[in-house]
Amino acid sequence: MQPTENSMQIQKEFIAAASHELKAPLAVILASAECISGDTNLSSEAKQHTAIIDSECMRMSKLVQDLLLLSSVDANTWPLKKTNIDVDTLLINTYEKYEPICRQKGILFELSTSDELFPVLNADIDRLDQILSIFIDNAINYSFPKSEISLDATVGKNMLVFTIKDHGTGIADKDKPFIFDRFFCADKSRTQKEHYGLGLCITKELVEMHRGKIELSDTVGGGCTFKVFFPL
């Protein structure tokens, strides 16, 4: 093994071990914060602080889950649980989950469906839901009020293609080659404290596990368009 490869392997093993060790204390802190917040005698200031603790613990818990997921992918210990998926149902469920969130933020979320029935997609439904969720979450986070986000699916040559399009801040050309790298954070206009640069990396890993691919392009008028290809 080359020195660089050895260093990367050591880093991956450390992240995996550290992530496992963080789960228990995080759970204890979160449980303690919930107990404290249930005290009816708490002052408004104390309630505010416990709410912050709860929020930050949940954020850290999400990071730990993402790190563990990537560690499992690295170790090839996370097999896909493929089933036959009804694409129409998946699209409708995804729309119903995110439309209220978009509406609350003043964003129009549109779902385009085909009049023709989609072929059955053989994939891991939980991972597919996670892939779409990451893209839509990103689209919401980087979209402006009164803008639009759209989700649709089409059938190409032996491929099912999901398209997520937003009219938000977009991604600079200089950042595009790196957006799927671990811990990469783009320019300040696309940097938020809730994100650690793992979401798109996770989508890439999960899509490639399905032998698919992702394409990124600019939305006409500004924003991003992601196309996710799954083999049929």
Label each region the model flagged:
Residues 55-60:
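Short alpha-helical segment of the dimerization/phosphotransfer core of two-component systems
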Residues 211-212:
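Conserved glycine-rich
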Residues 101-112:
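Short conserved segments within the C-terminal catalytic ATPase subdomain
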Residues 75-80, 118-123:
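Conserved micro-motifs of the catalytic ATP-binding
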Residues 81-99:
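A conserved beta-strand-to-alpha-helix junction within the catalytic ATP-binding
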Residues 171-183:
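Short conserved segment of the HATPase_c
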